[in-house]
A protein has these predicted regions:
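N-terminal small-domain helix-loop-helix segment of the aminotransferase-like
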Residues: 2-99, 106
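Conserved core of the PLP fold type I
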Residues: 61-161
Length: 161
């Protein structure tokens, strides 16, 4: 049998997968379930995205892209941030990935040294502590409060360091 890396023993089994499996089981039994587990949207892919994907495939855009995303997509994201969120980010400041967890994990792997402490504001997504551990870091959970809209305040951050 193949022996797994010692780093795998540092993490727990996925609570997301466990909850998703339970939600699917209960749904299959006819129960009315709203699953907040796997982060899957409860709507289909918007028509304009479907059409853009089909157009890209027909244009032969089926090869690997730049590691941080296609320049035209990064530019579109930059424009979206400006028009919809009143945020100014240059395309060079944007990195596109397959999902939020993947981007966060890449950042952790690129920046953590063994036993670096990573502050995780609570509430948090269940995977974050294990992602930190897998990257060699040590998670430190810092509680946030509803009266602060669950945002980590500067004083809370200072007190946790």
């Amino acid at each position: 049998m193949i022996e797994l890396s010692k780093s795998v023993s540092k993490i727990n089994s996925s609570a997301t997968i466990t909850m998703s499996a339970l939600a699917n089981k209960l749904k299959s039994e006819g129960q009315d379930i709203i699953s907040l587990s796997a982060g899957e949207p409860d709507f289909g892919t918007p028509k304009h995205i479907q059409e853009a994907a089909i157009k890209a495939i027909k244009a032969g855009k089926t090869k690997y892209t730049n590691p941080d995303g296609m320049p035209e997509l990064k530019e579109a994201i930059s424009q979206k941030f400006i028009t919809e969120n009143d945020l100014k980010y240059e395309a060079t400041q944007i990195s596109v990935g397959t999902g939020g967890k993947q981007i966060l994990y890449n950042a952790l792997m690129a920046t953590l040294n063994p036993d670096d402490e990573v502050i995780i504001p609570a509430p948090y997504w269940v995977s974050y502590p294990d992602m930190v551990k897998l990257a060699g870091g040590s998670p430190k959970i810092v509680k946030t409060a509803s009266e602060n809209n669950y945002k980590l305040r500067p004083n809370d951050l200072r007190a946790s360091i």
